[in-house]
């Protein structure tokens, strides 16, 4: 699908979609318990992959109205009968690889993007904790073969690639037969996502002790998550909020305080010069545009914001430096390189750094852009098109991964966005 974007003025109110990250975790942890209900889940391509994988491991997940009713496996997932295809969901691949180590074995694969993403730290850890885990191609990429069973022990993880490896082990290891200790080497990138995992696990009754970058948990535990309501997604909300800062004003509802690191978008927009108010009790964030100013941004804990921040920096007065984001090169695509290439087509003065981007703000012009089959690239480039006008972006269907209603919400806010096949 190709989306055409014209210069637009933004105004109005939309509701933040449910959090993709919380939905993944709540669905899986409930599926590993006896039974429960996840209210207001995000139903998207990625979360459907997790739901399908949970079914493959023996759970029964049914959508009833605005809730998922889940009959779980009581801590004993079944050995899947077929290969698990995670489609484009890296979260599903990493989480389900750890769950597979609680069974007799499973094979996991995904699309071409998934088959290019590294999993070495997770495979190493699973092997050290008693499972047998390897890449069929011998390159740490999917397809992956995982054979159980986890028995506990000690392992370490390189924290510089993805916190998903840690989250996967935190979910699976309390269900193993022995005590597990996990140590993080180096800086843990995207730490808020690991904290999100711990938050839901503890709500489900898991006992996990943390001491800085060391995580300890006994084996033989069980989960109970009878009900869980998914909060609004700050990662997705960053797009309408940034659109308002760039081209008007808008209110996004459903944004309450949580463990989401991407709530940093509120402070970033304010520091760049936008008028921002957040009523934490009502969950409403209102942004009014202004002349934005460039600034230095540490993206180590907010990797999903990087494409949006690149667009803001391309328009803001002065220089914007996005740093400590080298792990963003290992997402659906190399998002640092992709944003540099595409914004240059629009006239941006942008340079790649090993760990991020350096951007001198200015005027953008319309262009034909490549979306890289990456939902966050497509949504960020749509924001650039709202400012520049006369812009076309391909592979726009990829927004279904995390924000199926993105283009509808943008039109609701006044964006002139038209889709064609």
UniProtKB/Swiss-Prot annotation:
Q: Which UniProt keywords apply?
A: Amino-acid biosynthesis, Aromatic amino acid biosynthesis, Cytoplasm, Transferase
Positions that bind phosphoenolpyruvate: 20, 90, 117, 164, 335, 376
Pathway(s) the chain acts in: Metabolic intermediate biosynthesis; chorismate biosynthesis
Signal peptide span: none
Q: What is its EC number?
A: 2.5.1.19
Q: Which Gene3D superfamilies match?
A: Enolpyruvate transferase domain (3.65.10.10)
Q: Which InterPro entries match?
A: Enolpyruvate_Tfrase_dom, Enolpyruvate_Tfrase_sf, EPSP_synthase, EPSP_synthase_CS, RNA3'P_cycl/enolpyr_Trfase_a/b
Q: Per the UniProt entry, what is one GO biological process?
A: aromatic amino acid family biosynthetic process
Q: What class of enzyme is it?
A: transferase
Q: Which residues of the sequence carry a binding annotation for 3-phosphoshikimate? A: 20-21, 25, 162-164, 190, 304, 331
Q: Per its UniProt record, what HAMAP family does this chain match?
A: EPSP_synth
The name of this protein is: 3-phosphoshikimate 1-carboxyvinyltransferase
Where does this protein come from, organism-wise? Answer: Methanothrix thermoacetophila (strain DSM 6194 / JCM 14653 / NBRC 101360 / PT) (Methanosaeta thermophila)
Q: Which gene encodes it?
A: aroA
């Amino acid at each position: 699908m190709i989306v055409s974007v014209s210069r637009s003025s933004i105004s109005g109110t939309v509701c933040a979609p449910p959090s993709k990250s919380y939905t993944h975790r709540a669905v899986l942890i409930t599926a590993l318990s006896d039974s429960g209900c996840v209210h207001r889940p995000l139903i998207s391509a990625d979360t459907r992959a997790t739901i399908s994988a949970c079914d493959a491991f023996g759970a029964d997940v049914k959508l009833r109205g605005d809730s998922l009713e889940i009959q779980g496996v009581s801590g004993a997932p079944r050995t899947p009968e077929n290969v698990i295809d995670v489609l484009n969901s890296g979260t599903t691949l990493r989480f389900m690889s750890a769950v597979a180590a609680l069974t007799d074995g499973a094979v996991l694969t995904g699309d071409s993007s998934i088959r290019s993403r590294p999993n070495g730290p997770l495979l190493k850890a699973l092997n050290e904790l008693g499972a047998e885990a390897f890449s069929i191609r011998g390159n740490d990429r999917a397809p992956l073969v995982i054979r159980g069973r986890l028995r506990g022990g000690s392992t370490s993880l390189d924290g510089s690639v993805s916190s998903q490896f840690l989250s996967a082990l935190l979910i699976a290891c309390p269900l193993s037969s022995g005590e597990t200790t996990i140590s993080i080497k180096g800086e843990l990138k995207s730490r808020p996502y690991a904290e999100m995992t711990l938050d839901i696990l503890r709500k489900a009754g898991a006992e996990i002790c943390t001491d800085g970058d060391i995580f300890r948990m006994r084996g033989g535990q069980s989960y109970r998550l009878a009900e869980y309501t998914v909060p609004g997604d700050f990662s997705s909300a960053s797009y309408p909020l940034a659109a308002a800062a760039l081209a008007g004003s808008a209110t996004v509802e459903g944004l309450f305080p949580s463990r989401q690191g991407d709530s940093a978008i509120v402070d970033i927009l304010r520091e760049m010069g936008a008028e921002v108010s957040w009523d934490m009790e009502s969950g409403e964030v209102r942004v009014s545009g202004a002349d934005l100013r460039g600034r230095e941004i540490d993206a180590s804990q907010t990797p999903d914001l990087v494409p949006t921040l690149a667009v803001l920096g391309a328009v803001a007065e002065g220089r914007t430096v996005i740093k400590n984001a080298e792990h963003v090169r290992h997402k659906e695509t190399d998002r640092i390189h992709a944003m540099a290439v595409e914004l240059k087509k629009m006239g941006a003065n942008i340079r790649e750094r090993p760990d991020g981007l350096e951007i001198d703000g200015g005027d953008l012009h319309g262009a034909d852009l490549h979306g890289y089959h990456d939902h966050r690239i497509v949504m960020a480039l749509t924001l650039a098109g709202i400012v520049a006008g006369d812009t076309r972006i391909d592979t726009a269907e990829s927004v279904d991964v995390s924000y199926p209603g993105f283009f509808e919400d943008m039109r609701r806010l006044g964006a002139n966005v038209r889709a064609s096949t």
